[in-house]
Amino acid sequence: MPIRVLDELPAVNFLREENVFVMTTSRASGQEIRPLKVLILNLMPKKIETENQFLRLLSNSPLQVDIQLLRIDARESRNTPAEHLNNFYCNFDDICDQNFDGLIVTGAPLGLVEFNDVAYWPQIRQVLEWAKDHVTSTLFVCWAVQAALNILYGIPKQTRTDKLSGVYEHHILHPHALLTRGFDDSFLAPHSRYADFPAALIRDYTDLEILAETEEGDAYLFASKDKRIAFVTGHPEYDAHTLAGEYFRDVEAGLNPEIPYNYFPKNDPQSIPRTTWRSHGNLLFTNWLNYYVYQITPYDLRHMNPTLD
């Protein structure tokens, strides 16, 4: 799916160098079709890196996807130039009267922070409540999963003693589910989180359907039966070197982190890691766009009543 972005967005050249199909606004305006409108609430500190990762996964299908980037934290960023934020991000007030086909809420490095201590927690609640009436399907990633479970289901924050970091094996529970269509019976995906997602907790306190689990029994992929909300507790969007960057950052900070599991060849941090989850990540996002967004969203977004026959 060619993603439609502003011509000047840095991700355009970055992704083209990777042979990813990106359609700029100037080119897309000549095609007489309605693109899917997808809003990305980017909560990660390194916003440009995160943009590249998610746009890569949204790009591989014949339909257009019109991407809009959202920020809700008005504080000055230490990792992203203010000029970039001003040029390419909108504020919630700019879009609160609009409807969207899809919303992606990224992770955030807030695993050890209590929800009420998060500077933009009221804004997170506001966006999630707004999405119920203004978005066909919302996909939550990693920390955003924990936040959404608290806001939508009242589940308290669940925190691991040690950070889960590495590339883990998962297995699908419902091979005929739309979101896992085409998945291998088992697959690899990265995790980098303090948040804990026991499958039993999801089954006991929500009506969500778990579609894939880790080998240790943690819920990895789950969704509502009406396709309106979906959750992925890992980071299928990560680049090959993202976990390495986090590991060496923590080493330099004197945190004595564990070496990410099943990531560096021969468990040697000096070795170059390989991507073993790219196909899974691409298929997950393609399935979400197709079955959870495109197949149920109305042609006229003024009439939001998504259903799936």
Curated annotation (Swiss-Prot):
Tagged with keyword Transferase = yes
Q: Report the EC number(s), separated by commas if there are several.
A: 2.3.1.46
Q: Which CDD domains match?
A: GATase1_HTS
Site (Important for acyl-CoA specificity) residue list: 111
Task: Tell me which residues are marked as the site Important for substrate specificity.
Answer: 192
- Cell compartments where the protein resides: Cytoplasm
Q: Which GO terms describe its cellular component?
A: cytoplasm
> Catalyses which reaction?
L-homoserine + succinyl-CoA = O-succinyl-L-homoserine + CoA
> Which positions are catalytic residues?
142 (acyl-thioester intermediate), 235 (proton acceptor), 237
Cite the HAMAP family for this sequence. Answer: MetA_acyltransf (MF_00295)
Question: What task does this protein carry out?
Answer: Transfers a succinyl group from succinyl-CoA to L-homoserine, forming succinyl-L-homoserine.
Subunit: Homodimer.
Q: What family classification does the UniProt entry report for this protein?
A: Belongs to the MetA family.
Tell me the protein's name: Homoserine O-succinyltransferase
Organism, scientific name: Salmonella typhi
- Give the lineage: Bacteria, Pseudomonadati, Pseudomonadota, Gammaproteobacteria, Enterobacterales
